[in-house]
């Protein structure tokens, strides 16, 4: 034992590393490791992607600005939601509900289907919408998760980063929301709401076209304008597109939801000369926006859209097709919904439009844009008489418990939008409250004539 102990205290050879030195080196390495920024014992905040950061719907900002408390003693009347199911006045047809029951109970549509959509559903679309003037086949149809998704696929298949698409102002703000994350420029063109019929200012549109312009989005009937383009004006639009060789993305979700003497003409039925991508769905005429089924019809004149069509098919694979259950119900919905259902819907909206128009017609500093289609009405207000459209809507909520959306949400400052889908009693009550609000708040010293479409000067406007 004595010998072993003496050996354990042998003096280290020259150049050997001592135990203390090893310990010190380990401490140095530990400090270096702990000082590294990528250490794994803590979580770093992960920033959102540029794509998601650029995905902004301006309606959300405006809606937040109007999140004020209503008058506590007055019934709330909601005229700001573009959802026809709200309020229960416009329910889906019994046929649509029955078709969904059958689709679910059959268990034939519980699994995946083709990404472009079930053949039977696409054939039903051909059966309903194809005509001698508008011939297409099931191979030209791609189903989508709502018309908004159809628009998204059309935009993404047509334009690249740095290129631009012409969008209507006033217009549906989602067009811009769909463009910007891809660095596609949404160029606004003017919608003229001053005449008997709403029109596109084609002279202005000609000034904003350049070599990077890929398409024109045409929304007819229009949201938020309630306008329906005449056949003559649609032919002018088509001639313009043909002259500049620009394809058209036709947003026709409101289709034949027209009234007050208007007629709806599907754009693709009027011209074999312009390639058109029609976007449509069941949300706003069958009153089921939550069922999320839309479609694209690719009218591939001259073969211009052959590659784009392939792109749309590829994009459909992102979601592997929309809800199979609704696809299963679609043939029955399209074929068997009675015409009386659509007549009832048009009558409800037309009655409401005429109620509001008659009650607000003589209000000073205000001009009603009488609608002929869709389910909306735009009302122009004098800024000097009532302030901005945002403050007008805020105060209308506070004082009258009536909810409307400011025109700024649709690139139309100086207006507010009224949704026309509630019952006629609520609509009349709301219009009377708006009138009383205006009489009570009208600035007697203002020039009420300044209510002339201030929202249509696009030169100083943001795109959203």
Swiss-Prot record:
> Mind listing the GO molecular function terms for this protein?
L-tyrosine-2-oxoglutarate transaminase activity; pyridoxal phosphate binding
This enzyme's EC code(s): 2.6.1.5
One biological-process term from Gene Ontology?
Answer: tyrosine catabolic process
The cofactor named in the record is: pyridoxal 5'-phosphate
Q: Which named protein is this?
A: Tyrosine aminotransferase
Q: Could you tell me what this protein does?
A: Transaminase involved in tyrosine breakdown. Converts tyrosine to p-hydroxyphenylpyruvate. Has no transaminase activity towards phenylalanine. Plays protective role against oxidative stress, metabolizing meta-tyrosine and negatively regulating its accumulation. Plays a role in modulating the daf-2/insulin receptor-like transduction pathway through regulating tyrosine levels. Negatively regulates dauer formation. Plays a role in longevity.
Q: Which keywords accompany this UniProt record?
A: Aminotransferase, Pyridoxal phosphate, Transferase, Tyrosine catabolism
InterPro entries from the UniProt entry: Aminotransferase_I/II_large, PyrdxlP-dep_Trfase, PyrdxlP-dep_Trfase_major, PyrdxlP-dep_Trfase_small, TyrNic_aminoTrfase, Tyrosine_aminoTrfase
Quote the disruption phenotype from the UniProt entry: RNAi-mediated knockdown increases lifespan by 17.8%, and reduces tyrosine aminotransferase activity by 75% thus increasing tyrosine levels. RNAi-mediated knockdown delays reproductive adult development in response to oxidative stress induced by the superoxide paraquat. RNAi-mediated knockdown increases dauer formation in eak-4 mg348, eak-3 mg344, eak-5 mg337, eak-2 mg433, or eak-7 tm3188 mutant backgrounds at 25 degrees Celsius. RNAi-mediated knockdown increases aak-2 phosphorylation, but does not impair energy production in a eak-4 mg348 mutant background.
* Pathway stated in the Swiss-Prot or TrEMBL entry: Amino-acid degradation; L-phenylalanine degradation; acetoacetate and fumarate from L-phenylalanine: step 2/6
Lineage, highest ranks first: Eukaryota, Metazoa, Ecdysozoa, Nematoda, Chromadorea
């Amino acid at each position: 034992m004595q010998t072993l102990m003496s050996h354990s205290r042998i003096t280290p050879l020259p150049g050997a590393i001592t135990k203390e030195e090893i310990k010190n080196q380990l401490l140095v390495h530990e400090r270096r490791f702990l000082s590294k920024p990528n250490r794994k014992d803590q979580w770093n905040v992960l920033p959102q992607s540029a794509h998601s950061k650029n995905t902004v719907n301006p309606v959300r900002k405006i809606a937040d600005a109007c999140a004020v408390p209503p008058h506590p003693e007055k019934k709330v009347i909601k005229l700001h939601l573009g959802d026809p199911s709200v309020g229960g006045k416009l329910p889906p047809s019994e046929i649509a509900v029955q078709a969904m029951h059958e689709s679910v109970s059959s268990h034939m549509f519980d699994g995946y289907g083709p990404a472009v959509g079930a053949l039977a559903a696409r054939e039903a679309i051909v059966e309903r919408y194809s005509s001698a003037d508008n011939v297409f086949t099931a191979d030209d149809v791609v189903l989508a998760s709502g018309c908004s998704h159809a628009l998204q696929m059309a935009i993404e298949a047509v334009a690249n980063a740095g290129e631009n698409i012409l969008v209507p102002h006033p217009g549906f703000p989602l067009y811009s929301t769909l463009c910007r994350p891809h660095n596609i420029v949404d160029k606004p063109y003017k919608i003229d709401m001053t005449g008997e019929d709403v029109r596109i200012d084609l002279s202005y549109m000609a000034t904003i076209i350049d070599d990077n312009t890929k398409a024109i989005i045409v929304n007819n009937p229009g949201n938020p304008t309630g306008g329906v383009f005449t056949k003559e004006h649609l032919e002018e639009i088509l001639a313009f597109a043909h002259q500049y060789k620009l394809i058209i993305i036709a947003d026709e979700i409101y289709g034949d939801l027209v009234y007050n003497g208007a007629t709806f003409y599907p754009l693709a039925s009027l011209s074999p000369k312009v390639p058109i991508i029609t976007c449509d769905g069941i949300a706003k005429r069958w009153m089921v926006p939550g069922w999320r089924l839309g479609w694209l019809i690719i009218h591939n004149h001259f073969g211009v859209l052959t590659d784009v069509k392939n792109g749309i098919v590829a994009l459909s694979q992102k979601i592997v097709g929309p809800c199979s259950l609704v696809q299963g119900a679609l043939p029955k919905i399209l074929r068997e919904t009675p015409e009386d259902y659509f007549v009832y819907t048009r009558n409800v909206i037309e009655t409401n439009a005429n109620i509001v128009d008659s009650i607000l017609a003589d209000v000073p500093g205000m001009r009603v844009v009488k609608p002929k289609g869709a389910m909306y009405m735009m009302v122009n207000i004098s800024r000097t008489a009532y302030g901005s459209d945002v403050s007008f809507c805020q105060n209308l909520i506070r004082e009258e418990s009536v909810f409307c959306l400011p025109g700024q949400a649709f690139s139309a400052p100086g207006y507010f939008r009224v949704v026309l889908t509630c019952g006629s009693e609520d609509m009349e009550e709301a219009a009377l409250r708006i009138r009383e609000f205006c009489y009570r708040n009208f600035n007697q010293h203002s020039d009420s004539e300044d209510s002339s479409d201030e929202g249509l000067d696009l030169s100083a406007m943001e795109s959203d």
